[in-house]
Amino acid sequence: MLLTHLHSDHIAELGDVLITSWVTNFAADPAPLPIIGPPGTAEVVEATLKAFGHDIGYRIAHHADLTTPPPIEVHEYTAGPAWDRDGVTIRVAPTDHRPVTPTIGFRIESDGASVVLAGDTVPCDSLDQLAAGADALVHTVIRKDIVTQIPQQRVKDICDYHSSVQEAAATANRAGVGTLVMTHYVPAIGPGQEEQWRALAATEFSGRIEVGNDLHRVEVHPRR
């Protein structure tokens, strides 16, 4: 599991993932679930397991083959290599989501293909470097032209530390990636509005543009 930062909308389902992956793993000696995130991740995981302590106890009491709490393996990073197993490498670099700090992005490489997960960030040099030449960049996007028209300042504040569609596309262009996969839309995309968002991205990026949603699948192949 990869966590870019510890905002609630990025970790709210953590408890369900920890418990469900544990209960539905029928291996005799299951390997720990690896979690990679920024500093603070171990504390959040520990607190989450504590919050679900009653549930964990119920399940151990109910199932004879569950005898210990969920096995978890937490790794905290701000930069550099984070994973090298089974032909998959993951590298981490800082992003800019201040005042949330630290925040990180991930570059995942396997079989010559590379995908970068930006998370929430404004444009920054470290993300450009992490994404350089990647086959795909998954980037969160917001419509600042819409959000700035909302009267509540607390809502407008989200423009401070997120990338607009055009900014995310410009990052993809500077980094020379093959495909931009947009995600984490603010406001939510209404039915039939997908092409509006794609057109905004196309003003800054001439490559393949995917309007991603949950469970959206994009095949990535090494570019020659």
From Swiss-Prot:
<dbReference type="InterPro" id="IPR044094">
    <property type="entry name" value="AtsA-like_MBL-fold"/>
</dbReference>
<keyword id="KW-0862">Zinc</keyword>
<keyword id="KW-0378">Hydrolase</keyword>
<keyword id="KW-0255">Endonuclease</keyword>
<keyword id="KW-0479">Metal-binding</keyword>
<feature type="binding site">
    <location>
        <position position="120"/>
    </location>
    <ligand>
        <name>Zn(2+)</name>
    </ligand>
</feature>
<dbReference type="Pfam" id="PF12706">
    <property type="entry name" value="Lactamase_B_2"/>
</dbReference>
<dbReference type="GO" id="GO:0046872">
    <property type="term" value="F:metal ion binding"/>
</dbReference>
<keyword id="KW-0540">Nuclease</keyword>
<comment type="similarity">
    <text>Belongs to the RNase Z family.</text>
</comment>
<dbReference type="InterPro" id="IPR036866">
    <property type="entry name" value="RibonucZ/Hydroxyglut_hydro"/>
</dbReference>
<comment type="subunit">
    <text>Homodimer.</text>
</comment>
<feature type="binding site">
    <location>
        <position position="184"/>
    </location>
    <ligand>
        <name>Zn(2+)</name>
    </ligand>
</feature>
<keyword id="KW-0819">tRNA processing</keyword>
<dbReference type="GO" id="GO:0042781">
    <property type="term" value="F:3'-tRNA processing endoribonuclease activity"/>
</dbReference>
<comment type="function">
    <text>Zinc phosphodiesterase, which displays some tRNA 3'-processing endonuclease activity. Probably involved in tRNA maturation, by removing a 3'-trailer from precursor tRNA.</text>
</comment>
<protein>
    <recommendedName>
        <fullName>Putative ribonuclease Z</fullName>
        <ecNumber>3.1.26.11</ecNumber>
    </recommendedName>
</protein>
<dbReference type="InterPro" id="IPR001279">
    <property type="entry name" value="Metallo-B-lactamas"/>
</dbReference>
